[in-house]
Amino acid sequence: VGPYFLSFAGDRRRVAYAPSLAHTNCRPENFDEQLVSELLSRFDFLSVREEETVPLFQTLVDAPIDVVLDPTLLLDSDDYADMASKDVLQGEYIFMYLLRECPELIESTVAMTEATGMKVAYISDKNLDIPNSINLFGVGPEEFVSLIAHASLILTNSFHATVFSVLFHRPFRVYATDKSGARMRDLLSNIGLSDRCVDVMCADDIAPCEWSDVDSRLDSLREHSCAYLRKALS
C-alpha cells in the first residue's frame, strides 16, 4: 500500500486532496490500524471527500482532517463548455447512467419514459429492458458530459453524473441509499439538494430547483477547498 500513501516521495511535502473511500463499510478491523496511522502521520496536510470518513481516520492521527470538494467541482460549467458542445442526441431525452446494478433505478426509468414519452439514452455493457431506449457505445468523457448537459432528466447512482447534473443545472434524481452513496449524500446535503436522493420516483417528482442558492453554496465550498490547497502548497 506504500505507493498509495506516497512512499516514493522521500522527505518531500505530502498533501492529500479529497481521497475517497467510496464505500462507508470500511472499518478499523478491516485494515492494519498501526500501519495506516504511521503512513498518515507522514502527511503534512490531510483531507477527505466524505464527512462520514473523518471520524474513522481521526482516531488514527492527531493532525486535522479537512473535508473538501471532488476536483471536478473546483471548476464550473463554463470550464466544461467545450466538452459539452458536442450534440450526441437530438431532441428531448432521459439520460440513465448506472455505475452499479440498481433494479429500482431501471424500474423508475421505465416508468418515466412511459409517463413522459421521452426516449432514454443509457450506457451499459449489455442491453437493458427499457422501452424507447438506446444503448450508447464508444462514449468518452466529452460525450458523457454532453449527454448530461443536454438531457431533460438524469437518473443515476453515479457520483460524477450527479456532479455534472449539478454543474449544468439539469433536473436529476440520484439513487444513493446504499453504503456506496456517501459521496453523493454528502454533496447533495451540503448544497441543499438532499431531496434529489430518492428510492423511487414518478413524473410528479420533477420539481424545479433554486439553482442560485445551490451555486452560492457550491461557491463557498469551492473557496474552502481552494483555500486548503493554497495553504498546503504555499
Identify the residue ranges that each predicted region occupies.
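Active-site anion-handling motifs in enzyme catalytic cores
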Residues: V1-S234
